[in-house]
């Protein structure tokens, strides 16, 4: 990925030199041309296109902010309701993530959303224990974590 970014920057510099105009707009146009060239060459040079991973990172960040807003709304509803009709609980969520970086990212994203807190991992790192302020359905919570955070993390790292 670093090689592709460097190659894209070189293409942008070459573009600026060919244009004989040293402005940020020309550099940006050259960078976009470089992205297109690398996209076309990815089939011949057999490398994974680096913009795919950058797009996955952008999707992960936007997913986190969406989940953050939804979790804030849920916690506000709980706090402002006259009756404390909640079911707090600890859920063991199985995970497909393997590396320490992936597991740490998942734990951080879960802990940063209001109402949930990642507590610990199992000894074999196949389960993450999560405390939630309201768990009416454990299976739905597990499915939600798999379908949102875990899937997005796997897109970024694979």
UniProtKB/Swiss-Prot annotation:
Family affiliation: Belongs to the CPA3 antiporters (TC 2.A.63) subunit E family.
Q: Which UniProt keywords apply?
A: Antiport, Cell membrane, Hydrogen ion transport, Ion transport, Membrane, Sodium, Sodium transport, Transmembrane, Transmembrane helix, Transport
Q: Which residues cross the membrane?
A: 22-41, 54-76
Q: Which InterPro entries does the UniProt record give?
A: Cation_antiport_E
Q: Which GO terms describe its biological process?
A: proton transmembrane transport; sodium ion transport
Give the source lineage, highest ranks first. Answer: Bacteria, Bacillati, Bacillota, Bacilli, Bacillales
Q: Where does it reside?
A: Cell membrane
Function (record text): Mnh complex is a Na(+)Li(+)/H(+) antiporter involved in Na(+) and/or Li(+) excretion and Na(+) resistance. Na(+)/H(+) antiport consumes a transmembrane electrical potential, and is thus inferred to be electrogenic. Does not transport K(+), Ca(2+) or Mg(2+). Mrp complex is a Na(+)/H(+) antiporter involved in Na(+) excretion and Na(+) resistance.
User: Signal peptide span per the entry?
Assistant: none
Transport as a keyword of this entry, yes or no, is yes
Q: What is its main location?
A: membrane
Pfam families recorded: MNHE
Q: How does it assemble?
A: Forms a heterooligomeric complex that consists of seven subunits: MrpA, MrpB, MrpC, MrpD, MrpE, MrpF and MrpG.
Q: How does it sit in the membrane?
A: Multi-pass membrane protein
Question: Tell me, what is one Gene Ontology molecular-function annotation carried by this entry?
Answer: antiporter activity
Extra remark? Mrp-dependent antiport apparently occurs by a secondary, proton motive force-dependent mechanism, but the similarity of several Mrp proteins to membrane-embedded subunits of energy-coupled NADH dehydrogenase complexes raises the possibility that there is a capacity for electron transport that could provide a primary energy coupling option for Mrp functions.
One GO cellular-component annotation of the UniProt record comes to: plasma membrane
The protein's name is: Na(+)/H(+) antiporter subunit E
């Amino acid at each position: 990925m670093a090689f592709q970014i460097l190659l894209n920057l070189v293409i942008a510099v070459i573009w600026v030199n060919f244009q004989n105009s040293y402005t940020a707009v020309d550099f940006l146009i050259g960078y976009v041309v470089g992205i297109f060239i690398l996209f076309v060459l990815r089939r011949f040079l057999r490398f994974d296109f680096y913009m795919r991973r950058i797009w996955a990172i952008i999707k992960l960040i936007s997913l986190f902010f969406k989940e953050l807003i939804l979790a804030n709304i849920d916690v506000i509803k709980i706090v402002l309701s006259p009756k404390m009709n909640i079911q707090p609980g600890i859920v063991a969520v199985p995970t497909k993530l393997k590396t320490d970086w992936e597991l740490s990212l998942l734990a951080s994203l879960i802990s940063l959303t209001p109402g949930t807190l990642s507590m610990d991992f199992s000894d074999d790192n196949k389960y993450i224990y999560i405390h939630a302020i309201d768990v009416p359905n454990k299976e739905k919570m597990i499915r939600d974590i798999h379908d949102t955070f875990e899937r997005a993390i796997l897109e970024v790292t694979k």
